[in-house]
Amino acid sequence: MKSIKFFFACVLALTFVACSNAESDSFEDNSSNFESMISLYGIQSATVDSKVGDVPSVTAEEMASVLEALRQNGNTIRNCESKTLEGYYEGGDRKEVKMIAEYQARTRSGAFVEQFALCVSINFNIDNNGGVFYIDTTYSSSTDLFNWQGYGASLSTTAEGNSVFSSTSYLYFRVSDQGNCLVKVPVSFKGSYNFKDNKGTYSFTLSKAAN
C-alpha cells in the first residue's frame, strides 16, 4: 500500500514539474516574440496621457496583426478625397482634403481579426484670389483595437504649386499578455495636393519601416 501511495506521489510531482516547465517555456517564448515585435515595428513604451483616453486591451498577437497590415501596405499610394464647403471667413471657401486608409488585420495564421481604418482630414481656407491658408488637421480611426493620436501636420509648398504635408502620429495599445503594458507605435503620414487640379496622393507608413 505504501509503495502505491509513493508511486502516485511521484507521478504527481513529475506532472507538476512538467507543467511548470511548459509554463516557463511558454512565458519565455512570448517574451522572445514580443522583443522581436519591438524591433520589427518600432514599438515604444508609453505613459498615461489624458489626451490619449482609454486604450483598448488587446493581445500581442492582435497588436501584431494591426502593425503587420500597416507594414505590408506602407508603399501603397492612395488618392485624396476633397470637398468644398462654406468658408470659415467671409469671401472664401473651405476645402477639406480627406485621406482614408482601410486595412484588414489578420493573425500570422491568416485568421481575420478586424477591419480598421485611419483618416486624416486637413482643412484649408481659399480666398477669392486663390490664396490657400491652412486651418487645422483632425485624426480619426475606426477600430476597437487601439487609440490613434496625432498632433497637427507640417506643411510646405513646392515650386510646382503642390501643397505637401506630413506628420508623425501614434497608435496606442494596452497589451494584456505582456503585463497589461501601455505601448505606442509611430506612424508616418505623407501626402500632397494640387488645389488647381483638385488632385492629390498620400500614404501611411510605420515610422520604423520608413527609416
Where are these regions (language model features)?
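N-terminal propeptides/leader regions of secreted preproproteins
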Residues: 20-110
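Positively charged n-region of N-terminal signal peptides that target proteins for export
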Residues: 1-6, 20-21
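Mature secreted bioactive peptide module from preproproteins
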Residues: 85-211
